[in-house]
């Protein structure tokens, strides 16, 4: 069902006096010996550079002495807005040394984020586009303003995108591969499908918006949190240099265990002016236990079915901002053509696409977009789930 695993965790600090927290994630699938290190907000560039130089020396000393870990060292460096940090493969003694630096905020084990369990059906009616531009279910047309997201750039932080698919009309480009697998394509199909919903000529909402593919999950639909944080970092910097963050949308149809590092990165992207649409997850449980869905500043999206009920798989709870079509959604398939998938993975790009559409039409940006989507939506969802503060289904206001 286009679904992906969301695993709840508890965070326990194990640190020495005056040392940074080393967060424990006992219920998460972790990457062996891989960690994410976040620096405090007041860390200057000079402090950060000094820390990196110290780290290289300390880690080299520890590894030389023990020689227990292969391919060790720093992998990703993060530096945008107030957020500075890095990830890498380190031995236990080096991690303890890192935590003693007073400029370190916390150290977090690197965990696996994933998408999985796709459902493909033939001859399924494409209903999502029609539903978001009509006040009642059952309509057969998508009504929209001809501006159609022009001038807005959408970042697909996902499994990659078939940027040559005919539905993108040359408006999609390859941006970055944080998986570092040397495979700049979408071997999963997930990222191409979500991107088609956002900007495709036939399947999409913002039919004139541009799209940038940011691959953070492998062809098996999974990847480490460290790479996703790097993808967010890359997207923010790319947006700043190409039209500005206030004309940028990011879609994240992914999730996993609660992660302070991932939530912090998502929050910094929003602070920089980007709009973030995030899938709530597909475990029929409280979305508050997963990241980045639990980050308050993003727009967290639950899934609706064709009859305006909450999809049976959709997560619920206080983190939910909106609902959008997510059951049996037809969109682009790598290599050409289309396929049907279900999940909050499919709901989030409806919100991202509509956000791009409204940003072009009304000139709004950032956090104001989620509020505007709530204003335009219809109170249609039945059984929104325990503790869910909204039953609003997105709508474009009838163009």
From Swiss-Prot:
| Disulfide partners | none
Q: Where is the active site?
A: 158 (charge relay system), 190 (charge relay system), 345 (charge relay system)
Assigned keywords, A-Z: Glycoprotein, Hydrolase, Protease, Secreted, Serine protease, Signal, Virulence, Zymogen
Carries keyword Transmembrane? no
Cellular localisation:
Secreted
- Sequence ranges of Polar residues compositional bias: 282-294
Q: Name one GO cellular component term.
A: extracellular region
Residues forming the propeptide are 20-116
Kindly indicate whether the keyword Zinc-finger belongs to this entry.
no
Q: Where is this region: Disordered?
A: 175-198, 282-312
Q: CDD domains, alphabetically?
A: Peptidases_S8_PCSK9_ProteinaseK_like (cd04077)
- Write down the glycosylated positions: 251
Which Gene Ontology MF annotations are present?
serine-type endopeptidase activity
What's this protein's name?
Subtilisin-like protease 1
Species assigned in the record: Trichophyton verrucosum (Cattle ringworm fungus)
